[in-house]
Amino acid sequence: GQAASLFAGVRAERVARLALLDSLLLPDMDPDLAPKRLTGWLDALNDPPTQRSYDSYESLAERITRRNARLTPERALAIARVWGQQRPDGRIELLADPRHRMRNPILYRAAESYAVWRQVTAPTLFLDASDSPLMAAAGDEEMQRRRDCFRDHRRQIVSDSGHMLHHDQPEAVAAALLQFFDA
């Protein structure tokens, strides 16, 4: 959502509608953290994360469920089969670059995002989770300040969902997106 929202601001003429799912949650960062962040990033380049692997799709599904207790075992297994692939040795690994887990060397500066978001002209849907711990940590006032940067926006809350609302309530998320994009 962060990348899409910034693109919608700097290339406003190319975005007809923008939907953001439980998004814009990065906290503003203290500039004094920059030396430690850059040092950590450089150190990680010398020792990048490796890909985790699992005994089976079922064990990957168990890991996914530990991070999201709302998932049924069937839905977690379906996600595991999409997220994973079997290696020649039979183990399952994620179809993701493990370097994605590395921290960005640049600190997040909310004021820069606000300036870009004020350039968004597309109607914007904020599709938020009812029980997002990240949204709660950001605070209602800060989240409203961020939403208000978008000229034409509306907010819809998906009940009984956490940050991964598209996993928790895929039917409700799909219905909201279809209604918004078909308008």
Regions found by a protein language model. Give the residues of each.
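Internal catalytic or translocation cores that form aromatic/hydrophobic pockets or channels
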Residues: 21-70
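Catalytic active-site module of serine/aspartate enzymes centered on a nucleophile-bearing elbow/loop
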Residues: 150-183
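Conserved hydrolase catalytic core segment
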Residues: 1-34
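Conserved loop-alpha-helix segment in the C-terminal half of the alpha/beta-hydrolase fold
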Residues: 118-161
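Active-site loop signature of alpha/beta-hydrolase-fold enzymes
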Residues: 26, 134, 164
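Conserved alpha/beta-hydrolase catalytic His-Asp/Glu region
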Residues: 49-110
